[in-house]
Amino acid sequence: MLPAQPDDQASQCTQEAWTLAFGRNPNVGDARGRAIKAIETLLKPIVSPKNNKATIGSMTNELRQAPDKWECKLADRVYNVNGEINSKRGIEVLIDALATIGYQPDRHGSDQPQDVDEATARSVLFLATTVVGWLRDGTPRTIDSIEK
């Protein structure tokens, strides 16, 4: 499956995000917001189908709190830190991507709005497009849905 499909809210949000990021009149803050909305649209039915107010942050926390509830098609990541071999399960890799995308320093901790850095916002859009593809491809799913 592709990240964009016709007549789909997530596709519309993704297309709007790309236009806002790279169009003639860029607005990278809004581009990042639309990219996040695309993910929320696809992630909500999987993670929080009964929560009408689910956000990327709340759904990331839900995944983080119960990682054993999920099967994820992403490969486990094995890495070396100071000679010590560590591993991260595929679901944790997805959680890290969602946390990276969802973190918006311009929205937290200050009464003064901060400008959105163009390179950062575009990087979020690139990663968000990948996550949209993962979600469309069924990368995360509940263990219960596998057993049925």
Regions found by a protein language model. Name each.
Residues 1-29:
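Charged alpha-helical initiation segments
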Residues 14, 35, 42, 73-77:
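Inward-facing hydrophobic residues that define packing positions of alpha-helical scaffold repeats
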Residues 15, 33-36, 122, 129:
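Non-catalytic, well-ordered alpha-helical scaffold segments
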Residues 13, 26-34, 45-63, 142-147:
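Short acidic alpha-helical/loop segments enriched in Asp/Glu that coordinate divalent cations
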Residues 19-22, 43, 107-110:
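A broad detector of the eukaryotic-type serine/threonine protein kinase catalytic domain
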Residues 9, 13, 30-34, 90-97:
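Residue-level detector of well-ordered alpha-helical segments, enriched
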Residues 21, 39-50, 67, 139:
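Alpha-helix capping/termination and helix-coil
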Residues 57-148:
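Long, charged low-complexity segments
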